[in-house]
Every structure is written in C-alpha cells, then in structure tokens.
A protein has these predicted regions:
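Sec/Tat signal peptide C-region and signal peptidase I cleavage site
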Residues: 16-20
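Bacterial N-terminal signal peptides
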Residues: 6-15
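Short, flexible helix-adjacent loops and helix caps
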Residues: 55-59, 91, 127, 131-134
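Well-ordered alpha-helical scaffold segments within catalytic/enzyme domains
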Residues: 46, 50-51, 87, 118-121, ...
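Short, contiguous alpha-helical
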Residues: 37-41, 45-48, 59-100, 142-189
Length: 189
C-alpha cells in the first residue's frame, strides 16, 4: 500500500510541472473572482439580451392572473434596482440609484437603459476586485444599514449573481409563454 501511495504521489509530482506543456489549464491569478466575473458576465448578457429581445408589447405580461407577480417590465426594473443596490454596497458608496424605483418605469427603452446602466456599474465592481479584496468585510455602515452581521464583499457578489440568475429564469418563462427563444437557448454563432 505504501509503495502504491508513493507511486501515485510521484505521478502527481511529475504531472504538475507538465500541465502547461500538455495544454491543461493552470490556476490563474484570482481564480475566485475570475470564475465569478465570467458567470456574472454570461448571465448579465443573457438578461440584457432578454430585455432587448422581448417586444415592448409584452413588457406588461404576467405569467398568470396574480397581480402580486411582477410583469416582465417590472422584473427588468427590479434587476436594475438590485444591481445598483448590491454593487454600491460592495463598493461602500451611496447607491447612485437612491430614490428611484425602476420597477415603476413603463417603457421598454427606459427599462433597458436602466438595466444596462446598472450592469455597467456592476461590471466595474466585479472587474476591479481581486480574490483578496473580495474577502474584505463590507464597510461597517453597509452592515449597519442592512442589519447584517459581518459579511464579506464576495458574499454580496455571489448573492447578486444568484439573484440575477434566479430572475433570468423567470424571464425565460415569460419569453417561452410568447414562443420567444431566450438568449441562453439560441444556437451558438
């Protein structure tokens, strides 16, 4: 058994330096934020694509008769609101959207602009953090305002990514109801 263990260990020792030569992926700098940025970017593109692709006439669509369920347009506004809120908290600065409620906007053009502005704001946040800075605690005032215990910046970014993806799933349902193919199901170009 010890000989087998030594042989396996020796094999790993030989394989690790050979990885770059065999085309295997080598661990990049900031692997956590590299991974999270790639997932956030993919999903933000799906969401922005869905907002663009959905015809304006369906922005008032609900998937059923329940008025407490958001319309497609309200989902777009909700995502704009929360991307500004969460990313401003991660940055430790005042929400640039404070006092506005994009869920109340009516026109597709206004909603798409609000969403794209929110994503542009978050792009900077996701793109500027390293693994080390992502592990820093949120500013004390953010924690106090939110009523949260000590949280790390990355916690909120992961929440934002999951929240975006959750609501993209909702958007897909609205699109499918109207026989519109969502961006994530379009054939690769």
């Amino acid at each position: 058994m010890n000989k087998l263990f030594a042989l396996v260990l020796f094999g790993f020792a030989l394989a690790v330096p050979a990885a770059p030569q065999t085309g295997q992926q080598v661990l990049r700098k900031d692997p956590l934020m590299t991974w999270l940025l790639a997932r956030y970017t993919r999903d933000r593109n799906y969401i922005a694509g869905a907002a663009e692709k959905m015809p304006e006439q369906y922005y008032g669509l609900r998937p059923g008769p329940q008025t407490e369920v958001r319309t497609f347009g309200e989902l777009v506004g909700h995502l704009a609101n929360y991307n500004f809120l969460i990313c401003s908290n991660v940055k430790g600065e005042k929400n640039p959207n404070q006092g506005n409620d994009f869920e109340k906007l009516q026109g597709k053009a206004e909603l798409v602009k609000a969403l794209n502005d929110a994503f542009a704001y978050c792009d900077n946040v996701y793109g500027s953090l390293t693994d080390a800075s992502a592990m820093e605690p949120l500013p004390a005032q953010v924690q106090k305002d939110a009523g949260h215990p000590v949280e790390l910046r990355v916690n909120l970014l992961i929440f934002n990514y999951a929240h975006n993806y959750e609501h993209y799933g909702n958007m897909v349902t609205y699109m499918r109801i109207k026989s519109i193919v969502p961006p994530s199901s379009e054939p690769a170009h």
